[in-house]
């Protein structure tokens, strides 16, 4: 099998692990920077070019597209899809997951429980928005934030109004969410591949913070989850059309709440904490999908 990993940096842990896992199973792997690709878009002979040469066919593509390169990265991935390459996560699914507002709307439409979330444009609606999510304390999140960046805990109503006014002053799109106090600065990351949860970790915020992201200095440990949590994680990934996803769940009194679904979950923290070879599981999933394709 000939594989392409779409990544801006082939030295990153997740990219290295995927490359090593694929090579260990006898596959040829190229790491391709999507921003160095350019495309010929036509119905007769579409093509992808990379650093001055036309790329040959790849059986499958593993997208490791960062948030800052979503628009161009998914355009390149669409071109690979048009040329017949199997995408581990399809471009449309990645685009859905990267739009926090759209993804929450899709999850809610599927009946998946979420933290109460508000969204508004007019400053006149700020008071109602705060009340809608249960008042302070509450969380204000940039729609385009990632890895805990652009996430603020407002502990009082006045603080919430100030944060919302500041984000509006920056012309930034943001969400307002209830603060789930009983989660205690912890969340559960479920790594979903296909219709299975293959690894689970509980992430803890560092002292003095409420964000549990490992990139923000949080820690992680392997945990077990309930059947309800497992079902919610699988349902959330499927609702966005993702074959591989990191589903982040808050453990609330009323049950598991999906906080976010990550279309390009990092492997370092969850492989270390769970002691699972997730990279190889991703490669074997691709092998099975390609085998299904060829048997049709």
Curated annotation (Swiss-Prot):
Gene name tied to this protein: rimK
UniProtKB keywords: ATP-binding, Ligase, Magnesium, Manganese, Metal-binding, Nucleotide-binding, Protein biosynthesis
Domain of life: Bacteria
SUPFAM superfamilies: Glutathione synthetase ATP-binding domain-like
Binding of ATP, residues: 141, 178-179, 187, 211-213
Binding positions for Mg(2+) 2 per the UniProt entry: 260, 262
Cofactor note (record): Binds 2 magnesium or manganese ions per subunit.
GO MF terms, alphabetically ordered: ATP binding; metal ion binding; ribosomal S6-glutamic acid ligase activity
GO BP terms in the entry: protein modification process; SOS response; translation
UniProt xrefs under PANTHER family: RIBOSOMAL PROTEIN BS6--L-GLUTAMATE LIGASE (PTHR21621:SF7), RIBOSOMAL PROTEIN S6 MODIFICATION PROTEIN (PTHR21621)
NCBIfam families recorded: PRK10446.1, rimK_fam
Binding site for Mn(2+) 2: 260, 262
Name of protein: Probable alpha-L-glutamate ligase
Needed cofactors: Mg(2+); Mn(2+)
